Amino acid sequence: MTTALDQLKQYTTVVADTGDFQQLAQYKPQDATTNPSLVLKAVQKDEYKPLLEKTVRDHASKPVGSIIDNLLIAFGTEILKIVPGRVSTEVDARLSFDTKASIDKAHELIKMYDAQGIGRERVLIKLASTWEGIRAAEVLQKDGIKCNMTLLFSLAQAVAAAEAGAQLISPFVGRIYDWYKKNAGSNWDEARDGGANDPGVQSVRRIYAYYKKFGYPTEVMGASFRTTSQILELAGCDLLTISPDLLQKLHDSNDRIERKLSPEASRNADIERVPTDEASFRFLVNDDAMATEKLSEGIRVFAADAIKLEKVIEALR
């Protein structure tokens, strides 16, 4: 019997969302994604202490920010020994509103990968989907550096990223679901509001349909899943990045998977073009309470975890 994970791979490129690279091989993902929170979680495990300690030791004379960059590269390098495709490495969230600093940091990260013998075609630079982050991606893409736009919660962000020529976007399914469930309170009905009606699932479907209808080549990678149901409702999406625990659940399941998204079905979608000038972008994101709150919260969380990672490193110096 074919596993649900293997069936999903027939329709969608499966990506592993983890810094715990020792778990990767068993699921055979094509790509992998990381972020400061995942790396922070990984370095707290005993099996990654040697990599952390070696990185700190080898770069002890450098500023702590540089050591973090080297740690991200060390994790990315190990991941690329396992996955045949690409790894996503994130620019410090504290640069989310600084276009030039984001561009400079992306070039630094690519240069560091190059020093490890890893070509830029195997790396995606993750940037927050702020106006400034999207502008950074526009420049970087023209420089041949491929970008993964993260912390994406709205169609306005997705369209602006595609217009900027971003290689890939990561709309956050689970965090959208969390927001609507929390705000609904006792009115939330999982049977009614989950599954195909899940607000996070619907958001990704809308973005996917928009891209396919209007011919954008930017890849759509659903991210931030809470359940296997959310994943299976997006079977057929270009890519899905999935945590090891949910990959395991899919691996253990033999349920039959059906394709839910396809370019052909999306071309006739009832959807209008979205303006992408700065004023329209800022208004549309501001007008979406969920997108506004989750974007700002996401930046705060990633920034806080970067600071925690700095403290872990400082304690070893």
Curated annotation (Swiss-Prot):
Superkingdom per UniProt: Bacteria
Reactions listed under catalytic activity: D-sedoheptulose 7-phosphate + D-glyceraldehyde 3-phosphate = D-erythrose 4-phosphate + beta-D-fructose 6-phosphate
Active site: K126
Keywords from the UniProt entry: Cytoplasm, Pentose shunt, Schiff base, Transferase
InterPro entries noted in UniProt: Aldolase_TIM, TAL/FSA, Transaldolase_1, Transaldolase_AS
Presence of the UniProt keyword Lyase in the record: no
This protein's pathway: Carbohydrate degradation; pentose phosphate pathway; D-glyceraldehyde 3-phosphate and beta-D-fructose 6-phosphate from D-ribose 5-phosphate and D-xylulose 5-phosphate (non-oxidative stage): step 2/3
Enzyme class, UniProt record, top EC level: transferase
Biological function: Transaldolase is important for the balance of metabolites in the pentose-phosphate pathway.
Subunit architecture: Homodimer.
Family: Belongs to the transaldolase family. Type 1 subfamily.
Protein name, as recorded: Transaldolase
Organism: Paraburkholderia phymatum (strain DSM 17167 / CIP 108236 / LMG 21445 / STM815)
Taxonomic lineage: Bacteria, Pseudomonadati, Pseudomonadota, Betaproteobacteria, Burkholderiales
